[in-house]
Amino acid sequence: MPSLKDLKNRIVSVKNTRKITKAMQMVAAANIRRAQESAEAARPYAERMNAVMSSLAGAVGSTDGAPRLLAGTGSDKVHLLVIMTGERGLCGGFNANIAKLAKAKAMELLAQGKTVKILTVGKKGRDALRRDLGQYYIDHIDLSDVKKLSYPVAQKISQNIIDRFEAGEYDVATIFFSVFQSVISQVPTAKQVIPAQFETDAASASAVYDYEPGDQEILTALLPRAVATAIFAALLENNASFNGAQMSAMDNATRNAGDMIDRLTIEYNRSRQAAITKELIEIISGAEAL
């Protein structure tokens, strides 16, 4: 049975931990609003870009002159998995869930006889995947010094991916990230970015556009921007998801710390009461002996 001193030290330790988790919860709560607004503000642009690119891709089709970023290499032998996680932990299952989805995809591709290459964005994903799939890991894009996510950051990542594609390092690129739904709900998602794929809705499919100077020229010019836009949207979704997950995790940790403090306090009081009772019994017994 722990001594009164040990119990008191544990109570102090848990109280200090609760202060830290509460502070982290408040920081995440302050960040989540801005992150959520940024993610939601980027969605209409990404959707409109998708509609325009879908129209252009439909006009050009899969002709011999179609850009390689759209038509691909004609093979799907080598897959590049771009896994985007957080730079920090203490966010529940946020990082682990993205890594889990990426691992499952990697194992599926390997079972099909494909070649897998892994590029990570985010320290936590790098650590987990190098530990489990180190032989397929090729590089890491460091964002630890980035204070605010911006489009140029996404362009840096997309240019890295496009340069590798043009150098013939892979055939298909897929990004892994988490879509923000709410503070308690983030959905790990995989999205193919090269060869580019664009969803077609009925309104876009029925519309007829004239492009100048021409469909193919505009498509070729916009494809790198479309890849960067998809990555930027994924970064913003990931950032909102991270802050939501961290806020939820730290709230749970704060509540658990409070429950533990209550239990330890009850145990401390009972032990103290037992010690006092024992001393009183000893005093009474001594007095009776006299």
UniProtKB/Swiss-Prot annotation:
Membrane topology qualifier: Peripheral membrane protein
UniProt subcellular location: Cellular chromatophore membrane
Record-linked Pfam families: ATP-synt
MF-aspect GO terms: ATP binding; proton-transporting ATP synthase activity, rotational mechanism
Entry's Gene Ontology cellular component terms: plasma membrane; plasma membrane-derived chromatophore membrane; proton-transporting ATP synthase complex
InterPro entries listed in its UniProt record: ATP_synth_F1_ATPase_gsu, ATP_synth_F1_gsu, ATP_synth_F1_gsu_CS
PROSITE patterns (alphabetical): ATPASE_GAMMA
Biological process (GO), any one: proton motive force-driven plasma membrane ATP synthesis
Superkingdom of origin: Bacteria
SUPFAM superfamilies recorded: ATP synthase (F1-ATPase), gamma subunit (SSF52943)
Keywords carried by this UniProt record: ATP synthesis, CF(1), Hydrogen ion transport, Ion transport, Membrane, Transport
Annotated family: Belongs to the ATPase gamma chain family.
Oligomeric and partner information: F-type ATPases have 2 components, CF(1) - the catalytic core - and CF(0) - the membrane proton channel. CF(1) has five subunits: alpha(3), beta(3), gamma(1), delta(1), epsilon(1). CF(0) has four main subunits: a, b, b' and c.
Function: Produces ATP from ADP in the presence of a proton gradient across the membrane. The gamma chain is believed to be important in regulating ATPase activity and the flow of protons through the CF(0) complex.
HAMAP family named among the record's database cross-references: ATP_synth_gamma_bact
Name listed for the protein in its UniProt record: ATP synthase gamma chain
Organism: Rhodobacter capsulatus (Rhodopseudomonas capsulata)
Lineage: Bacteria, Pseudomonadati, Pseudomonadota, Alphaproteobacteria, Rhodobacterales
Gene name linked to the record: atpG
